[in-house]
UniProtKB/Swiss-Prot annotation:
A motif ('KMSKS' region) lies at residues 593-597. Disulfide bonds: none annotated. This is Isoleucine--tRNA ligase. The gene is ileS. One of its GO terms (molecular function) is zinc ion binding.
């Protein structure tokens, strides 16, 4: 009736068989087509780049993104799960540069832009097969046959439409600003790109001496972390509200001007203040040019100005200003009409006028500049300083802040709307809203979207010599306004650059501006561009916007999460998603960041091939909250497999084994209702589980849901099945046995449905054998079914509480046994419980589980246990020295057992002593709980248990019997006997144990299906250790 439950190739083998089944029956497509008349639940899949290999972080994002859509389909929603590929931008271009052995824009143009772009296009799916394999292997169900691709013309056209919307709203403009610039890639970057590339670096810093004009021996001291900017200095900036001084060092006659508060740190001991004054007095003072390679001809230069941003946190209180190389500097320059001196070319090298370092990369000249200043007596001091410096997020080159003409989206005008839309988003964890993400929005700057590169969505703006500009928002508009536009126009460079427009003002030809756009604009446009909106699928987009759910790694707070919100706010003034789970980083088994240089990168395929997808998924769901860092290794996943999957599998295997023996078909007992207390308890727990997990997943509490499933499965195995084994072993198919079978069957099937979104493979395997295998009318896959209904009538909270208490007492009893080093197979005479309310049924369970003869309720455990609670004097004494005697007295007045257990379990007890409210906890109290001689104790909360550990001769004999039965069962298993096989037992040599066996022969025979016991007969004996005694034993199967 049932397929035999085996794991010849482990769980990985099961998963391969299940994957084959899904393919054979087209289950994934059928799942996608479910609930066509249902309400939409919208999920957006953030697009990865397929020109790079997937890593273990991508496994995390995919398993987290998979679970909610699966769950929502089961709840009756129609869910579109469209995969996407991010195909433009620097990541692709850099790979092609490596492939071709070229570097930088000049070599690209020498190679040929058309050929280069073709190479880029051909490369974007280099690793797509690897991505598809990983996606399939982990069970991430997303439509990869019909993905959105950012380089396809329809997608680009939708992006153009978005840019045209911004143009029409006067949000898109061209400006000349100092921007973060990558000299290696030859393009400026946006603020959200820059935020992803900061690194702590140790750079050379310098305090330079700027000679006051008209003074022989007086200098301004200004500190800089970028000595390479000093040749372009045109001003010094102070804060007019601060106090400044003229001061001398202990040795020397030079007078230095700097902030008073920073003088001790800068000048050292023994300095002398010559004069003290407010910073305002310095405004307008002039100084001599520090490095006079080029003298500016326009604007003010070499003058002291004011800036609010100057602080006293470090440096000298005087900041050197080079408007060409910093946002703050540029702003100060504009406010004060300062000269603009740019001495660095687009490759990041000094121009030829800077003769000592002409043609050299500026960041490599810091030491040479410092040495030069020292030779010229213009250096006060130089030292290494660790600070955070931006690097290119793709090529890792240190960025320069460089003056460039670029196209911008005026995000600063939308700041209030961005913040308002952010308030409508539920973030998990919620501190992202007003923390990492909210702070970024508060400080938002205009988005520089143009890139001086080649492979990307072309900026659809055409310019005329007369100054007229037009933004094109569709292919149709391009064909209408363009000159000889090909019917099948390719929208990329260099083809689009050949398309000219007629200028409506002067009738000359307009040319497209050369830039492409930030590839993050592509991915941020996916809510509408994936549907080619507004040119197609208008109703589909509107029904699926905004998304109910997205999830990506924490880095995307500065990336995709931001660009989604920025574009959506600019165009629709709406939040583009409602719920977002932000994922933490994946670390190695030691908690360290994975990196190739450390050699600690875990290959996701290695883990999937050895441990399987379900184990990997379950590890990510349960190891920690999704937003916290997760340690990941093969060992971690193997432990997850053992703890949960193997437990579930063993319960399933147990059911099939005995149901097959009895030829039990649950379909014959659909309406059977069991009145067994254990059956009622597990059905109550099951329905509570269905209800709780439903609530958790509906509120995106994935880890809580998974842990509750894991706890239930543990109780199912280690309590329900363990307590009910004898019911399955009985010879007759009684109502009690039918109740045991039907209950376990219903629990397994429902548990698999609840766990299906988490572990889709093992649940399918169990469902196929328990449901499809028996019922020809069953749905052909568990993933085509609905979420199980909750039977509220089956939930009995009082029953759950009583059984949970009994289970808790049993676990405490086991703990007490372990503490006393007494096996559970050794019977004991008595257990004493602090609790006084426990029905007889549960007392019998406890006695049976713990192998105890008697349970005494409501016992005063203080008679058997030494509770000692003392103040931890180094802690409490330091805070309440004189009150210690009174604190001791107050502690002694409490119930010592309850207080001791409360503190040991992390609780807090509040006492009041002489009007002082004092919190007592594990840090300021010393607690010991030790059973007296002949007793063992364990406790948790208000529940305590004491075992009488005195072992009489009679108890010892019973212990020997239980140990012998255990050895026989192991021998049966090792011999490969079936559960129902009858055996002959051979025992020899130990007279004491042989006498015990004879005394308890009937018990041993019944427990082990032994028909005959042969004493000292001929057999192929092996030695067994029975409580320190050696017994020779052998078993043989009866004919």
């Amino acid at each position: 009736m049932y397929k035999k439950v085996e794991l010849p190739k482990g769980f990985v083998g099961v998963e391969k068989e299940v994957a084959d089944l899904w393919k054979e029956k087209n289950i994934i497509k059928k799942n996608f087509d479910m609930n066509q008349d249902g309400e939409y639940f919208t999920f957006y899949d953030g697009p990865p780049t397929a020109n790079g290999k997937p890593h273990v972080g991508h496994v995390l994002t995919r398993v987290m993104k998979d679970i909610i859509p699966r769950y929502k389909v089961m709840k009756g929603y129609k869910v579109i799960r469209k995969a996407g590929w991010d195909t433009h931008g620097l990541p692709v271009e850099l790979e092609i540069e490596k492939k071709l052995g070229i570097s930088g824009k000049p070599q690209i143009e020498d190679y040929g832009v058309e050929k280069f772009v073709t190479e880029c296009k051909d490369s974007v799916f280099t690793y797509v097969s690897m991505w598809e394999k990983m996606t399939e292997q982990i069970g991430y169900w997303v439509d990869m046959e019909n993905p959105y691709v950012t380089y396809h013309n329809p997608y680009i056209e939708s992006v153009w439409w978005a840019l045209k919307q911004m143009w029409d709203k006067k949000l898109l403009y061209k400006g000349y600003k100092t921007m973060p610039y990558c000299p290696r890639c030859g393009t400026s970057l946006s603020s959200h790109e820059v935020s992803q590339g900061y690194k702590d670096v140790k750079d050379l810093t310098a305090v330079a001496k700027f000679k006051v004009k008209g003074e022989d021996n007086k200098y301004f001291l200004a500190w800089t972390t970028t000595p390479w900017t000093l040749p372009s200095n045109v001003a010094l900036c102070i804060n007019k509200a601060y106090d400044y001084v003229e001061a001398k060092q202990a040795e020397g006659d030079e007078i230095f001007i700097l902030a008073k508060e920073l003088a001790p740190k800068v000048l050292g001991e023994g300095f002398e203040i010559v004069r003290e004054f407010k910073g305002e007095e310095l405004l307008g003072m002039e100084y001599e040019q520090l490095l006079p390679f080029v003298t500016p001809t326009e604007g003010k230069a070499f003058v002291v100005v004011h800036g609010d941003y100057v602080t006293l946190s470090d440096g000298t209180g005087i900041v050197h200003i080079a408007p060409a190389y910093g946002e703050d500097d540029n702003l100060i320059g504009k406010q004060n009409g300062l000269a603009f001196l740019n001495l660095v070319d687009l490759s990041g090298n000094f121009v030829e006028e800077v003769t000592p370092w002409a043609g050299k990369f500026v960041k490599k000249c810091d030491q040479q500049i410092v040495d030069y200043l020292k030779e010229q007596n213009k250096l006060f001091k130089a030292e290494k300083h660790t600070h955070s410096y931006p690097h290119c997020w793709r090529c890792d080159t240190p960025l320069l802040y460089y003056p460039k003409e670029s196209w911008f989206v005026a995000m600063t005008t939308l700041r209030d709307k961005l913040l308002a839309n952010n308030e409508k988003i539920n973030w998990y964890p919620d501190n992202i809203k007003n923390g990492r993400f909210g702070k970024f929005l508060e400080n938002v700057i205009d988005w520089g979207i143009s890139r001086d590169r080649y492979w990307g969505t072309p900026l659809p703006i055409w310019e005329c010599e007369c100054g007229h500009r037009e933004c094109i928002g569709s292919i149709e508009e391009l064909k209408t306004k363009g000159i000889n536009v090909p019917e099948d126009i390719e929208l990329h460079k260099p083809y689009i650059d050949k398309v000219h427009l007629n200028c409506p003002h002067c009738n000359k030809e307009m040319k497209r501006t050369a830039e492409v756009i930030d590839c993050w604009f592509d991915s941020g446009s996916m809510p509408f561009a994936q549907h080619h909106y507004p040119f197609e699928n208008k109703e589909l987009f509107e029904a699926n916007y905004p998304a109910q759910f997205i999830s990506e790694a924490v880095d995307q707070t500065r990336g995709w999460f931001y660009t989604l919100l920025a574009i959506s706010t600019a165009i629709f003034d709406r939040n583009p998603f409602e719920n977002c789970i932000v994922l933490g980083h994946v670390l190695d088994k030691k908690g360290l960041k994975m990196s190739k240089s450390k050699g600690n990168v875990v290959d996701p395929f290695e883990v999937l091939d050895s441990q399987g997808a379900d184990a990997t998924r379950w590890h990510f769901y349960t190891a920690s909250a999704p937003w916290l860092p997760t340690r990941f290794s093969i060992e971690d996943v193997a432990e997850t497999q053992r703890k949960f999957l193997s437990t579930l599998w063993n319960v399933y295997s147990f059911y099939v084994l005995y149901a097959e023996l009895d030829n039990f078909n649950p379909l014959d007992y659909k309406d059977f209702v069991s009145d067994n207390v254990m059956d009622k308890w597990i059905m109550s727990k099951l329905n509570t589980l269905v209800k709780d997990v439903d609530d958790h997943l509906n509120n995106y509490r994935i880890t809580q849901a998974a842990l509750e499933i894991e706890e239930f499965t543990d109780e199912l195995s280690n309590w329900y099945v363990r307590r009910n084994r004898a019911r399955y072993w009985s010879e007759e198919l009684t109502d009690d046995k039918i109740g045991a079978y039907t209950t376990l069957y219903r629990v397994l099937v429902t548990l698999c449905k609840v766990a299906a979104p988490f572990v889709p493979f093992i649940t399918e395997e169990i469902y196929q054998n328990l449901v499809v295998n028996l019922d020809e009318n069953a749905l052909e896959s568990i993933h085509l079914g609905a979420w199980p209904e909750v039977d509220e009538k089956a939930i009995d909270k009082k029953l759950e509480e009583k059984m949970d208490l009994a289970y808790k007492i049993v676990k405490l009893g086991r703990s007490a046994r372990n503490g006393a080093n007494i096996k559970n197979r050794q019977p004991l005479s008595k257990m004493l419980l602090s609790t006084s309310e426990l029905p007889e049924y549960y007392g019998d369970i406890i006695k049976d589980e713990l192998n105890i003869k008697e349970v005494e309720l409501g016992a005063d455990l203080s008679k058997y246990v030494n509770f000692e609670i003392k103040p931890n004097l180094p802690v409490l004494g330091r805070a309440y020295g004189k009150l210690i005697p009174a604190i001791r007295k107050e502690i002694a007045s409490r119930n010592q057992m309850e207080l001791a257990q409360k503190i040991q379990n992390g609780g807090v007890e509040v006492i009041t002593v002489d009007g002082n409210e004092i919190e007592l906890n594990a840090e300021n109290l010393l607690v010991t709980m030790q059973g007296l001689e002949g007793f063992a104790f364990a406790g948790e909360g208000s529940v305590g248990v004491v075992l009488d550990t005195t072992i009489t001769d009679e108890l010892r004999e019973e212990g020997h019997v239980r140990e012998i039965i255990s050895k026989i069962q192991n021998m049966r298993k090792e011999s490969g006997f079936e559960v129902a096989d009858k055996i002959t037992l051979y025992v020899a040599e130990n007279d004491m144990l042989l006498d015990v066996i004879k005394k308890f022969e009937d018990v041993i025979k019944k427990e082990t299906l032994t028909e005959e016991i042969v004493y000292n007969g001929n057999a192929d004996y092996s030695e067994a250790k029975v409580n320190g005694e050696i017994l020779k034993m052998a078993v043989s199967k009866r004919a």
